[in-house]
Swiss-Prot record:
GO molecular function: ABC-type oligopeptide transporter activity; ATP binding; ATP hydrolysis activity; ATPase-coupled lipid transmembrane transporter activity
Annotated coiled-coil segments of the chain: none
Species of the source: Ralstonia nicotianae (strain ATCC BAA-1114 / GMI1000)
GO cellular component: plasma membrane
The protein's name in its UniProt record: ATP-dependent lipid A-core flippase
Length: 592
């Protein structure tokens, strides 16, 4: 995958024609606007070739004979050319911007949709900063290719073509000298090209790493401040930005060679042309107007040639960004597998010989798990850190797929069920609360397509079950109050209870609780524990517990160690066995 925080991970090197071909697929629906932009740029280019022709005719014929009486046409033609050129330039910019912004929208939506469809392993491989960078920054790099760079390529290429036609028409011998120079320029540019693309790719990876450093420092600001980590974070970011500066300077050196090399070759060509023109003038093979028009066209040719050579560096940045973009778009989506639909499951779960490894060579996080959870049963999962509790519950909504074995819901393997239907059967409350920068009602009813689909009476009941009504009623806008980034306007306990209210609103037959009362004070914990116990009634519930006092009333407690089930039974049965659970219980209550 292209988007990664590791500088060692690079996107697959695809060919430039491959990138352009894929971009063309996004351009094709806007073909009419694209053609209008091309026509407008062609008009702009054509006006460049007319000006030297007017000057040539003026010098050769304008100071005598019949043409002298028509000199008023010259300023009129110049004004007319300026008007036509201005209108065409506006049209080209407008229509191409129209196309590029629609392409930008489609690319961003495609990338974001692919992010939403990516498997959980994708989010473990990539940092949030690198994904944000890809969707926001990298697409803008491609936008530069589609606007400024493309305008330069098309308009200035047409201008060069128009001027070359005039040059051949005026003096083909002198034009051949120019034609000799162009392949030399092209060869030099191709050599610089390869260097620029390599540097751009490394620069892109380092940019992702720098963004990740900022994300960590900003997200963990409390730890940074309490532990005096400001100097460490500053040194870390300084080291990263210095590496970025080094690559930026190498890119500047490689890109900076374009202009002086082009200008030197242009000056050399002009010197040779002047020498040949003087010889032709002595042999009456050229006129004053012809030579002046030729030199003028040559001078007009330098500017678009310069633009064409300068466009190389941003174009390479855009093509490198395209590698990242298409790398993300090509990310495999979650396997959908079977299409069997279920309305509401009973909640009977079976884990049959389930083994799971993180990576092909990793240690087994789960090893031959056999577990039957009856419909409506409350099963607590306990064990030391790293024993496999979280991994086990992550397999249920198919965030990950078992390495071997299978999980069965109501007699059907999870792989045979519609993934969307399966996840509708599961509500999840974690100690790591995730809330959205939206209203309280929208967070409780998360998943509703729009505000009109939210059942406000149901939201109210969910808030009551989570003991949040008093808090919400005291807010200025009630359930329509915006809670800020990840609920930043709420206290830790209020955030946890809002997550519980979301699970209550969903009313799923299967409930997963991962230390759901960990962030609550004693009073709130008693209230929410009572609400959770009511919520768990009639639902299949898996509870991950670190505080054993919260799961004493579970129907069954399953103890895991090193990815295996080592004990199972009720709280009293496990204490009587005096095994691992009893040991954990003694340690925990001794510290209390």
């Amino acid at each position: 995958m292209a988007v990664t925080s590791s500088s060692s991970s690079q996107p697959p090197a695809a060919s430039q024609p491959g990138h352009f071909k894929r971009l063309w697929a996004y351009l094709r629906p806007e073909l009419s606007s694209f053609i209008l932009a091309m026509v407008a740029m062609g008009v702009v280019a054509a006006t460049e070739g007319i000006i030297p022709k007017v000057v040539k005719d003026l010098l050769d014929q304008g100071f005598g004979g019949e043409y002298a009486g028509k000199l008023w046409r010259v300023p009129a033609m110049l004004v007319g050319i300026a008007v036509v050129r201005g209108v065409a330039q506006f049209g080209a910019t407008y229509f191409l911007s129209l196309v590029s912004n629609k392409v930008l929208l489609n690319l961003r939506m495609k990338m974001f949709e692919r992010l939403l469809q990516a498997p959980a392993a994708f989010y473990q491989r990539n940092t949030a900063a690198s994904l944000i960078n890809a969707v926001i920054f990298e697409v803008n790099q491609v936008l530069q290719v589609l606007t400024g760079v493309f305008i330069t390529l098309v308009r200035d290429s047409m201008t060069v073509l128009a001027l070359l036609i005039f040059l051949f028409y005026t003096n083909w011998r002198l034009t051949l000298v120019v034609a000799v120079i162009l392949p030399v320029i092209g060869f030099l540019m191709s050599r610089i090209n390869r260097r620029l693309r390599s540097l751009n790719r490394e620069h892109q990876n380092l940019t992702n790493e720098a963004a990740y450093v900022v994300e960590e420092a900003a997200g963990g600001y409390k730890v940074v401040k309490l532990h005096g980590g400001e100097a460490y974070e500053s040194r870390r970011f300084n080291a990263m930005t210095n590496r970025l500066r080094g690559y930026a300077m190498r890119m500047a050196v490689a890109g900076g060679l374009n202009q002086p090399v082009t200008q030197f070759l242009a000056a050399l060509a002009l010197s040779v042309i002047l020498a040949i023109a003087m010889v032709q003038a002595q042999a009456n093979q050229t006129t004053v107007g012809g030579f002046t028009g030729f030199v003028m066209a040559m001078l007009l040719l330098i500017s678009p040639l310069k633009h064409l050579t300068d466009v190389n560096q941003p174009m390479q940045r855009g093509l490198t960004a395209a590698e990242f973009i298409f790398g993300l778009i090509d990310t495999p989506i979650e396997p959908q597998d079977g299409g069997k639909h279920i309305d509401r499951a009973r909640g009977d779960l079976r884990f049959e010989h389930v083994t799971f490894r993180y990576g092909p060579d990793g240690r087994a996080a789960l090893d031959s798990i056999d577990l039957h959870v009856k419909a409506g049963e409350i099963v607590a999962l306990v064990g030391p850190s790293g024993s496999g509790k979280t991994t086990l519950v992550n397999l249920l909504p198919r965030f990950f797929e078992p390495t071997s074995g299978r999980i069965v819901l109501d007699g059907d393997a999870l792989a045979d069920l519609s993934l969307q239907d399966l996840r509708r059967q599961i509500a999840f409350v974690s100690q790591d609360v995730v809330l959205f920068n939206d209203t309280i009602a929208a967070n409780v009813a998360y998943g509703a397509r729009d505000a009109s689909e939210i059942d406000m009476a149901r939201v109210r009941r969910a808030l009551e079950a989570a003991y949040l009504t008093d808090v919400v009623d005291n807010l200025p806008d009630g359930v329509d109050t915006n809670i800020g980034d990840n609920g930043s306007k709420l206290s830790g306990g209020q955030r946890q209870r809002l997550a519980i209210a979301r699970a209550v609103y969903k009313d799923a037959p299967i409930l997963i609780l991962d230390e759901a009362t960990s962030a609550l004070d004693s009073e709130s914990e008693r209230q929410v524990q009572a609400a959770l116990e009511a919520l768990m009634q009639g639902r299949t519930t898996l509870v991950i517990a670190h505080r054993l006092s919260t799961i004493e009333n579970a129907d069954r407690i399953v103890v895991l160690e090193h990815g295996q089930i080592v004990e199972a039974g009720t709280h009293r049965e496990l204490l009587d066995r005096d095994g691992l659970y009893a040991g954990l219980h003694r340690i925990q209550f001794a510290t209390q």
